[in-house]
Amino acid sequence: MEQFGGPSGFMPPASYTAPLGKYPTKQPSAAYPSDGGRHATKENPRPAEGQASRQSSSVPSAMASKPIQDPEGHSAQPTSSYCRAQTPRSTPLPVALDEEARLSQYEVIRQIGAGRFGEVFIIRHKATKALLCWKLVFYKGLREKEKKQLVSEVNVMRELRHANIVRYHDRIVCRSRQCLYIVMEYCDAGDLAKQIEAAHKHHGGIDQDRIVLVVVQLIHALAYCHEGVGQERRRVLHRDLKPCNIFLASHPEYPDDSSRCIAKLGDFGLSRHLNMHSMAHSCVGTPYYWSPELLEDGQKTYNVKSDMWALGCVIYEMCTGKTPFAQAQTMPQLKERVRCGPVLPVPGFSDSLNALMASLLQPNPNNRPSALQCLGYTIFRGCSYTPPPLYRSSSAPSWTPRNASPARGSPSSAVSTVSTVTTSPGSSSRTSFSAPSSHDAAASSPASASASSRYQHQRSSSYSSDSAGPSGASAPSQKAPGPGRPPETPSRESFDLASKARPGFFAEAPPPHAFAEASPPESHASEFLPPANGAANEARNERTQRDRTRRAASATAAAAVSAFERQQREGRSMSPDPSAPLASIEEEEEGEGDDAGCGSLGSGSGVTRRMPGASLNREDRREAPGLRHADTHKRDDRDGAIWTGRREEAPFSRPGSELARDFGAASQNKVDTSRFSGASSGKPRPGNPQNEDRASFASDTSARQTVYLSGLSRRCSEPPAAFHSAVSPWDPAPPRLSSAASSSSSSRAVSPSSLRRASSREMKYPTDDRPAVAAGSSGVALARAERGPEPGAPWGNEETEGLHVHGRPSAAPASSFSSERTSRPGHPDEARESEHCFQGRGRFAEAEASPATEGKDPRDSGFEERSGRRDEGRTDGGEAQSFGYWPNGRSDEARDRLGAPSVSPFSSKRITRRSSTAAGLSTYASPSDPAPSARAPAEWRRGAAGSSTVSAAGACGRFLPSPRSWQGNEKSFPSSSDHPSAYPALPHPAAPAYPEPGAQASNQFPRRRQSAFPSVKRLDYEEEHASSACLPTLLSPRFPHHPVSRPAGGVSPRSSQRQALAPTLAGMTFERRLSAGPLSSAPFSAPQERTTRLVGHRHALAADAERAEAPFSHAFRPGHHDRTPVGARRVPPRAETPGVSLDPGFRTGGPLDRGPVGSGGLEGQSFDFAHPTHASSEKKEAETEWSNPTAPVFYSPRSPRNDLPPGDGARSPYSAHLRPGVSEACSSFSVPPTERYEDDKNSHHAGSGGAFSPPTFGSPTPGPVPVGNERTFGRNPSPAATCASFSAKTGLRTPAPNGLAGDSGAFRSTNSLQRTPMSRRVSAPFGAGSAEGATAFGSRYASSGSFSKKFPQGSSSGVHEGGGAFGRRQEGDVSRVDAHGSVSPRSFSFLQRSDAPLSRGQPEGSHFQKHGETRASPDFARKGDSTQTHASGGRDFSQSGPFETQDFTFGEQPTRETRHMAPSPRGIERGGPQGSFVGHDTSFSVYAPRAGHAEGVESGCSAFEAPSESLSRRDGEADRENTVPNANGQMPVSGMPASKQTYGDDCDLYDNSAWTAQKHAPENFHAAVAPYPSSLLTGFAEGQQKAASRSSCLGGDR
């Protein structure tokens, strides 16, 4: 009867029109009822007052006849505005009625369908007016097999009692007519097949949220059947699961809302009981839903996994509108297609849903998950559905029918009250329903009933779980007036089971829908009929149902463990997937007190900071006005000896997600609890959803030394032995006290969804290497929990989170704690990834040990919290926000309110910055580093990358916060001003343009770069670690040593041997900088800032030197194109010593007053050129950088991964940066260096040993104005050894919303992006002379093309309180790692400010254009090379528009390089037009050579590459070239038609409309590069099938 709806098929009512609306992403708190029903209508009236139901039948009621279950504390049914048909419930008559009398109890309404065995009718129970349906089957003409099948259906249905299974009520055998009446529940919303057809025909498909809701109900029903039903605990196989056998019933609370239907499994005519280990041996059901074991000729045995296969087919049909194998017309075709499997993933749906379908449609039934295992999948973790028990107990509160008038004794005001606890605006809310007792009915009012029963509904991109606050206490529920009982709380046992079955809820909060039992009121007991098996069986079945629910919940975790053990038996690897896209940048800023400042345990303070939310995806932008947040404080001053705890809730207030955590610290034998939890929003990924860690701070003699671990960790970490000591994770443990034994713990976790394994290990040492003052007075506890994605899975939204808590409590000497939480939300739609990191660190100082705390509270402590965000496109840096805080005895509330400055009771000791590069190659050092020189010391060439500098600054009077802690319209922070101010205010328009001499700078914005702790007696220690994006390397803070990469001797990132190589340790560099200029009061007249900077050098081998920079300011002068930059200055060195050079610094800056109308954009450019101090045997690096302040973001010019041309899968929004420089590593300075500076023209300078031809800086004005601000630089320290290298980078990064979106994510089709010719070559020679097997890797590439697209600027902007000023601030940092022990600067900052009080909508813009000339560089030619031509082409950079959008137009001529190189693993090769070219060169070391992907060009492009050797070392020795062909056996070529070139002074863009390129990536693409890291190539593999049928290229048309 599958062609009809209803329980056995029926047609939907004529009034039903719109099938599937969009599912709400958050389900109502009211659970799905065990039975469904409709409103009382004229056709379905209610019984009159006093009308007694007939007690002459044992037939149960209709679908809607039983009230919904009442949860403990969360009533499942708000009866405020809903009156359902009353279920007849009473004891049966002692005298049985005959068949005619039983049939006369029902009134036949109409026929709704017909099937193989009979007809289906809607009927009404005359006594209760409840709508039911019966299947009328004439068994006279049935064969014996069909009769057995009919009896089987009745026998199966009578034992099934589940909210998501069509309810069986009674059977009536009419022997006079030789027919059987099967009375069952009536599902009024039709079957799923018709809903799918109508949705895909008229509405474009079904929303994923609704699919998830239907599927989770079906899984609950199948889990109920497969785990065994009845007294004999026999499993039930449906054997005919398909959409037309899945029926939909109206929700009892929302009968007119088709989007909230309840899915019910029906038509068990082909079902069969199955013993625990038996098999069924018949092929029944629809062939399109048959599993592979059913289609095999010789194998027709199957078990419950066949139903799971059919469920996967149903999910696929809901997503696509057709069965997975609908193309098959014959049985052999069907077998072949089933053998090949369906086409997955289904586009437009999340990875989690596709993963569920892929696991259900596994050909091997042993690999398919069971129904219980499916409940652990990530896609269901936010789904709030839980099936309720079917029956109520007599102990539950009574209920009053809805809409009964007060005169009838059923006041309409007798409603359940809705209590909603909302964490924050826009965040997920918890709705609980408390059912009033019969005494409350009379006291309630209809108005309150209507208001309180409103459904709390919100929409977002996915489901999210409701959770209580971190403390586990929920807000009190609202209760109806009167002496009604409060809502009951579920037991701990029931919650523990529920949390196991549905991970995602916190262990201290009840599940959102914990169902209890309730019974109907005794006054209406006469209106109800009992089930067929009587009251005794009903109670027994009720207990059985609860027991089954507990067993099913516990089986979820057991299933995961079983899968884990099976996976372990199969010998699968426990190590992380090396190709997983784990590339990340982590910046950690740690503030630690001096040892002398340690004191007794004191009180702490908490400052709640806003967690910066990631960008909204498209759906969020459409449905949510923006991100909101709510911050709360909770102080707990328990006594003077215990540190004050705090509670922080920092929710992502995007609809449907929240994060909360508790922080606290205590003295010895006290417990510090740290917990965080998250509900994912967007596209979830596999991974455990929550962690809870409890670390006990106990004395040394205590036995509690356990580390609690939970969650799925894809990292194997070995923390340092002592957290605050600079010890490598891989160095031996420091000496420990003999009385304290070390302990270690390991944990392994498995994701129930992915069945992938991972492990983590934590080493814990009870004491550090410092002796304790007294026995038992010192202890340490370490707790770490990480929740991460499974290895190899793509990034999802807000998925990865980790928590690291470390404490060292003590009663007397010193106590400290630290915590770090990192979350990495990814944005697949935008091919970006962000990272949020919160760190807390404190030390409790003694009053007498620290002069800064004199007269202060001895319990003063410090806390610093940092949050950062990283975009994947800017792989070498990121944005960060930090907020540091040291109280001086005043209360938190007063300080926060006044924003008063405070003095740190201890000194900031160090800053540690760790960075993992995202180049995608297994490297010793950053891709920006040159290859090691043969003359370099062995320690350098060993690859122990990372260098350190130590600098000291004079004592400042006050603590200054990091500039990254500021954002518009944020909370106040301690400033350097003597006057407290809640917000930094803009100056009055009448304020002077320049501050008067001696004027106090107040209300200023902090404008510091780089340093986050300009505090008292600052001593900064900087250390940078480089890491591979893919494989464990020597310097990765996250991974242990790789057996191949670990050198002999155990060189560590913090090795003293490495630090001894830094000559600058012999001296110090100090810098003091004050930004005291007021902001401008008008866009075009007032100066922007004023800066005074004093920089000094103190070197052991040289005289002290100081230089001061004059105040610098610039203003806008619109309409004048011939202005030259102002504010330039050059400061000579103060002293020089033979053998040590203190190079001069040069800095120039000023406005770029261009544009025909003077848009008023805040512009400027800056050229910084400064050499660090150096001595012999020291590598020196000098770099000049140009940054356009109007470019909102930045990227490192030294990383080939970042230098992607426009349209080349750009991963960051947009940026522009130019940074040429010179890198040297020489043994001695036997000959004075040769340096030249020239301005205002293009020139080429060569010293005696080398020639350098950097790109030139363009003129700030177009046209015939001479080029200004050019810098060319040549340096030859030693004529005997050519050991200098040059690198220069230019580029503009633009996003491709519709284009190929990044090299570690899925590639996307290009819609309107113009084609961008590009030529790039990467050479990977074998490193014969390199140490430790590292090979040199040279890269030369350039780009050309055009791109014009509007997109959001992505800056933080806001209106300051108290005024209409509109400002914006952007800042970024880039870290560069040096493998040669360089002491040159390794990072730079980029800052854009537009703080002028412009009105909303005020446009701003800038324009930059550079010109150059062609010149040959014969000194760069090597053996086998033909000439190389390097030249700079034209470049246009412009932006205009309102604050929210920016327009960019970019054009650059390509590069022609006559070098034969291996394929590029970073992008698709392109051809470009002939003409002037510009070339770029960089080199870095790698573990092994790596072949790239296959690339080519269309016909019409001529190849011009000639075989040659590639040099990546500058010591005169050539490495062997790696000429490994690509996967297609081809060498990449690029060319261009001679006619495609257009040049002009205005740098017109050439016509590239006829250009295209082909991506040739064979199916064995991954196999071709299997030995090498492939995170950069994952996007090609994922997009292979999509790209097979179209011409796909970076920037090309689809």
From Swiss-Prot:
One of its GO terms (molecular function) is protein serine/threonine kinase activity. Keywords: ATP-binding, Cell cycle, Cell division, Cytoplasm, Cytoskeleton, Kinase, Nucleotide-binding, Serine/threonine-protein kinase, Transferase. It is found in: Cytoplasm, Cytoskeleton, Microtubule organizing center, Centrosome; Cytoplasm, Cytoskeleton, Spindle pole. InterPro entries: Kinase-like_dom_sf, NEK_Ser/Thr_kinase_NIMA, Prot_kinase_dom, Ser/Thr_kinase_AS. Its main location: cytoplasm. The active site is at D240 (proton acceptor). Phosphorylation status of the T-loop (amino acids 267-293) modulates kinase activity and subcellular localization of the protein. SMART domains: S_TKc (SM00220). Residues 106-380 form the Protein kinase domain. Disruption phenotype: Conditional knockdown results in severe growth defects. Defects in centrosome outer core separation. No significant effects on the centrosome inner core splitting. Its EC number is 2.7.11.1. The record marks S278, S282, T286 as: Putative phosphorylation site. It catalyses: L-seryl-[protein] + ATP = O-phospho-L-seryl-[protein] + ADP + H(+); L-threonyl-[protein] + ATP = O-phospho-L-threonyl-[protein] + ADP + H(+). The keyword Transferase applies. Pfam families: Pkinase (PF00069). It comes from the Eukaryota. ATP binds at I112, G113, A114, G115, R116, F117, G118, E119, V120, K135. Probable serine/threonine-protein kinase. Involved in controlling centrosome splitting. Promotes separation of the centrosome outer cores. Belongs to the protein kinase superfamily. NEK Ser/Thr protein kinase family. NIMA subfamily. This is Serine/threonine-protein kinase Nek1. It comes from Toxoplasma gondii (strain ATCC 50611 / Me49). The lineage of its organism: Eukaryota, Sar, Alveolata, Apicomplexa, Conoidasida. The gene is NEK.
